[in-house]
């Protein structure tokens, strides 16, 4: 394989630029030409495919977002869109593609492989909801950003003896909420993978204030409900008068990636190029126990249960991290 391309698709994530940089420089070191596909699958169909060299990716390892830009393009799920994209790949002599994104992006990579273009998927999403990898590119930065914000909110919460409901991203996965909540000593962590009773939360809040607590921090995963809705239900369930809600929003998707995300993205990008050089396609790169692994995209792109609840009341984290966390610890003070 002499000529490959790289694209980013779906929601952006810190560390995508580091992955692109690794793909480009590893490919050059292997004697391959590299092209960047701008604006994801939409750019592929439009022919926005341009050569990249080592200088093209200089000084981007520390930048958030993706300099190739990203776009959602549902039309690529249809055969017509796929054939248009493949026509452009052939026109530019592309023999393999590295796709950086989430599960929707993986479906596109799977279709390319089925049409004879080996594609490698790299897990680029802050949600950490990709099966087959302990961590995704961008997750660590998103958790760090959320942690910093929650720490600041705790300061003002303590000043006024307030209860704060802080909504974090994650789509249908509770990983950001779980990690950021534990890291900040949140009083409650509400995630889609575990049930909760509003009356228990009300009782916990009141008991805390009676014991002299100066604040109450509730970290809420967006996959459960919005902070506004949760706050309203909390007020209806009990007399919680001094309550504020905050949605951290897209701040979690931006910013300079953490060292962990930069290194993870670099390792994954280089590994993807090595696979393409061997003619391997249709797989997604992951990290398990700090080692690079490959999984069939077909299984990786399909949504799987990240958590399961045992009869003993424990959350077993099937993916992305190996751990048992008692359900009770999520519904009582961790501070």
From Swiss-Prot:
Main location: cytoplasm
Gene name of the record: pfkA
Binding locations of ATP: 11, 72-73, 102-105
Subunit annotation: Homotetramer.
Keywords assigned by UniProt, alphabetized: Allosteric enzyme, ATP-binding, Cytoplasm, Glycolysis, Kinase, Magnesium, Metal-binding, Nucleotide-binding, Transferase
InterPro entries: ATP_PFK (IPR022953), ATP_PFK_prok-type (IPR012003), PFKA_ATP_prok (IPR012828), Phosphofructokinase_CS (IPR015912), Phosphofructokinase_dom (IPR000023), PKF_sf (IPR035966)
Record protein name field: ATP-dependent 6-phosphofructokinase
Activity control, per UniProt: Allosterically activated by ADP and other diphosphonucleosides, and allosterically inhibited by phosphoenolpyruvate.
Gene Ontology CC terms, in alphabetical order: 6-phosphofructokinase complex
PANTHER family: ATP-DEPENDENT 6-PHOSPHOFRUCTOKINASE (PTHR13697:SF4), PHOSPHOFRUCTOKINASE (PTHR13697)
Provenance organism: Streptococcus pneumoniae serotype 2 (strain D39 / NCTC 7466)
Catalytic activity: beta-D-fructose 6-phosphate + ATP = beta-D-fructose 1,6-bisphosphate + ADP + H(+)
Coiled coil stretches, renumbered: none
Any one GO MF annotation of this record: monosaccharide binding
Ligand binding (Mg(2+)): 103
Any matching Pfam family: PFK
